[in-house]
Amino acid sequence: MGRYWLLPGLLLSLPLVTGWSTSNCLVTEGSRLPLVSRYFTFCRHSKLSFLAACLSVSNLTQTLEVVPRTVEGLCLGGTVSTLLPDAFSAFPGLKVLALSLHLTQLLPGALRGLGQLQSLSFFDSPLRRSLFLPPDAFSDLISLQRLHISGPCLDKKAGIRLPPGLQWLGVTLSCIQDVGELAGMFPDLVQGSSSRVSWTLQKLDLSSNWKLKMASPGSLQGLQVEILDLTRTPLDAVWLKGLGLQKLDVLYAQTATAELAAEAVAHFELQGLIVKESKIGSISQEALASCHSLKTLGLSSTGLTKLPPGFLTAMPRLQRLELSGNQLQSAVLCMNETGDVSGLTTLDLSGNRLRILPPAAFSCLPHLRELLLRYNQLLSLEGYLFQELQQLETLKLDGNPLLHLGKNWLAALPALTTLSLLDTQIRMSPEPGFWGAKNLHTLSLKLPALPAPAVLFLPMYLTSLELHIASGTTEHWTLSPAIFPSLETLTISGGGLKLKLGSQNASGVFPALQKLSLLKNSLDAFCSQGTSNLFLWQLPKLQSLRVWGAGNSSRPCLITGLPSLRELKLASLQSITQPRSVQLEELVGDLPQLQALVLSSTGLKSLSAAAFQRLHSLQVLVLEYEKDLMLQDSLREYSPQMPHYIYILESNLACHCANAWMEPWVKRSTKTYIYIRDNRLCPGQDRLSARGSLPSFLWDHCPQTLELKLFLASSALVFMLIALPLLQEARNSWIPYLQALFRVWLQGLRGKGDKGKRFLFDVFVSHCRQDQGWVIEELLPALEGFLPAGLGLRLCLPERDFEPGKDVVDNVVDSMLSSRTTLCVLSGQALCNPRCRLELRLATSLLLAAPSPPVLLLVFLEPISRHQLPGYHRLARLLRRGDYCLWPEEEERKSGFWTWLRSRLG
């Protein structure tokens, strides 16, 4: 599998998508779809504003997370067996959805939320698996007009309800054997199965169903179909009569017999019949008599050797006739003795064996507008052949020898606008009447190889010109006239052409030229031969330039000086015999209006910011079949001026540390969308680790990534140093606290917390070293002294009664559990002492959680805000307000304190 990187930053005018790091999705605007159309095989809808294609999908939810929510077209390919409910509910504006996911079932509600969807397609390998669709699968698709299911087999009794606005239904490459099975799959099609009187489809496509051989009588009763496509199926058209179709206008079919589908034509009064790639051979008069309703008849590649007499007379309404790819040796369409006139407007006789056209070949076709005679064996043409074709607009004679053309051979065609003479051996005449009427605007012509310079006489007011150069042509051609004021499109195919423009430059000869295509051309004839090697044709109105090299360019030609150029395509400019690497700035110069740039097999090796500084309007950059690309780090600083879309397709980035900066940069990019499809493995990597191999290679081998590793290591060290005080705090407080709680819980399980037990101490006194003086001088005499001055209680003081050598936590726990009452002496210093905090926290926890909690008394030696106490202690104060007291400074109030303490200690 290839490697895909998807890195965001879409156009600011589009909803910005963030968080994309890697994906196998490609997004584009509809206007730019032709640049990347190969990745949108199933949804080539350039009228949509925004499209996305995702390949190798295995986790649909994860894949769709990176797709912009505003896409109108979505193509998905991969392996996802089940479509879950609300699978596309995040895309309410979706209009076209194509799924090639090897689906086996759609769960109810899978297409919920797609109220604007107009076209839905399911694709799979033919006859491989079944697709389960619930009856209400399309109930939410209120705008659906087109439904295509190609490949999977449907249940014959699925009972799927169709959206009311559906106009186009296709079930192709499936297991269907009988047309009547459609009634079980889609019962709405049959009259009486729903509230509709009858269903009308613009097109029903059943093509390429290799098992389709039957049509059960009455199975589609009442259905109205404008176009029915049965091409590449074994079903004979004669079966269609009994289907019960209320209407059928056009039929695409193949016939298993050597007969025209005349019965179907007569039964439905068809307006169109297209029978291709069938062995008809000849047409009988009986079959011809049934075709009087036809307006279109297509009989391409049907093995016809001749046409029956009265062929056109039998079809008075016929407007379009296609007879290409047959074995006709003569075109006897018009019978002079009858004088009948046909309404035919289009006639295609291409690919036959016509050598000579009779004088009256087209005499009955005064309404003919398009005549196609390509790839026959015509040797000569005379003007009288076209005398009756006063309305003819298009004449195509490509692929005929045409060794002789009569004088003024096109003079009889005043309406002719398009003429194609490619792949002919025509000898052009300088006489003014050679090209016929002045309305000729589009001309395609092959120039013969000449031993000496020659003048190329052309119509002056052409708008489109295509010139193919014969191999071996090396001499100059001088154009006549010297100016073509209306020419907008020029295509030159083949190398060796040298146009002599006289004293004028190209802009003077072609002042209106907007589109220029140079095919199979090395550009040597269009570039200066000095050190600069600049493109010579300075055309101020040129908007599109396409160059397809012949693989023999000696050096790059700099395309510059075209102020209106919007689209530039350069392909196959790399020399096959002497390949060399080039920089983008050697190919593209100052093009201020350029919006789309496509480079394919040009030898490009690196991209730098310098190349983009003269391309201020560039929006799309496509790189195809370029090897070992390096992206210079100067692009990092130039990021705000980068194109909105960069596609690196079927190309590979060099496994070089110069590219190490790129991955983190593109992940942070906020304006440029970059899609990289790279199939290459770096040295030392196997096929199993191909995905993401370049990033892993750069991570392991490049000093830039070593610096990153050192940065991460130092960051981890700093983090650890910051965390040490926290760990120390946990060691001094929370860990002992948890240990103590565990011991209390464990002793409770062992029965040591029973109410009847005898206590070793009456009071456990918790205090800090700073408060020890108050405990000894004030508290100890009052509690341990004998009556009447004291209470005669036994106190547990940590400094005096803790067992030497025993763990502090164990001493605290044992002493608390061995005391009837816990007395915490609190002050500012005590709250900062770790042991006092532990004792207070433990005592509070026992008060709140123990099944037989001890008495907890709090003595505050100084005023302390409750916000200074931990949460547990604040809660304890709120629960038992009588268990705490403040030590008074005034002597007269101390007796009240001792009275409170004696009452609490009983």
Curated annotation (Swiss-Prot):
**A GO CC annotation given for this chain:** membrane
Q: How does it sit in the membrane?
A: Single-pass type I membrane protein
- What is reported when this gene is inactivated? Has increased susceptibility to the uropathogenic E.coli strain 8NU. Following infection, kidneys show a significantly increased bacterial load and increased inflammatory response, whereas bladder shows a similar response to wild type.
The signal peptide, as residue positions, is 1-21
- Side of membrane Cytoplasmic, spans: 731-906
For this UniProt record, give its keywords in alphabetical order, as a comma-separated list.
Glycoprotein, Immunity, Inflammatory response, Innate immunity, Leucine-rich repeat, Membrane, NAD, Receptor, Repeat, Signal, Transmembrane, Transmembrane helix
User: Which ranges sit in the Extracellular compartment?
Assistant: 22-709
Sequence intervals crossing the membrane: 710-730
Name where it mostly resides: membrane
List localization entries.
Membrane
Domain named TIR: which ranges?
759-905
Swiss-Prot/TrEMBL LRR repeat ranges: 91-114, 115-140, 142-170, 198-222, 224-247, 267-290, 291-314, 316-338, 341-364, 366-388, 389-412, 414-436, 462-484, 485-508, 510-533, 562-586, 591-614
Instruction: Give a brief account of the tissues where this protein occurs.
Output: Macrophages, liver, kidney and bladder epithelial cells.
Q: Which Gene3D superfamilies match?
A: Ribonuclease Inhibitor, Toll/interleukin-1 receptor homology (TIR) domain
PROSITE patterns the record matches: LRR, TIR
Example GO BP: inflammatory response
Subunit composition and interactions? Binds MYD88 via their respective TIR domains.
Q: What biological function has been recorded for the protein in this entry?
A: Participates in the innate immune response to microbial agents. Acts via MYD88 and TRAF6, leading to NF-kappa-B activation, cytokine secretion and the inflammatory response. Plays a role in preventing infection of internal organs of the urogenital system.
Q: What is this protein called?
A: Toll-like receptor 12
From the broadest rank down, the organism's phylogenetic lineage runs: Eukaryota, Metazoa, Chordata, Craniata, Vertebrata
